A protein has these predicted regions:
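Core segments of cupin and vicinal oxygen chelate
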Residues: 9-47
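Acetyl-CoA-dependent GNAT
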Residues: 51-53, 97
């Protein structure tokens, strides 16, 4: 799984993480161990590490989330549709941010089973 970006993040349940990232989001399953699972997402490598520590839920999208930059509107819409079809937990519903400015973009935030935020 060649990757251009690698991100490691904590999860409380590897089985739930695999179901969310592979079966629902469509990531490619990579290496697995008893403490971590590797996923491929659009050429990037995500590594879910099992954490015994309680994972604090964030109070907002900052300072910690990870996002996928999609260059075509239809890619974004397909992912939003997939998330809605699977009844994923939206931290923020699909919407347009900063309308009429040079940084205008479409966005939504999902929350994985461990409370990690994905844009």
């Amino acid at each position: 799984m060649p990757a251009i970006f690698h991100l490691a993040f904590p999860v409380h349940d590897l089985t739930a993480a695999k179901q969310f990232y592979v079966e629902v989001l469509g990531c490619v399953l990579g290496r697995e161990s008893s403490t971590a699972v590797t996923f491929g997402l659009a050429g990037h490598q995500l590594v879910a590490h099992l954490s015994e520590d309680e994972l604090d839920r964030q109070k907002g999208i900052y300072p910690r989330h990870f996002g996928l930059v999609l260059t075509r509107e239809e890619q974004w819409q397909a992912l939003a549709d997939r998330a809605q079809a699977h009844h994923l937990r939206f931290y923020q519903q699909p919407r347009r941010r900063f309308s009429g400015t040079r940084i205008e973009h479409r966005t939504f935030f999902l929350e994985d089973p461990s409370g990690n935020l994905l844009e």
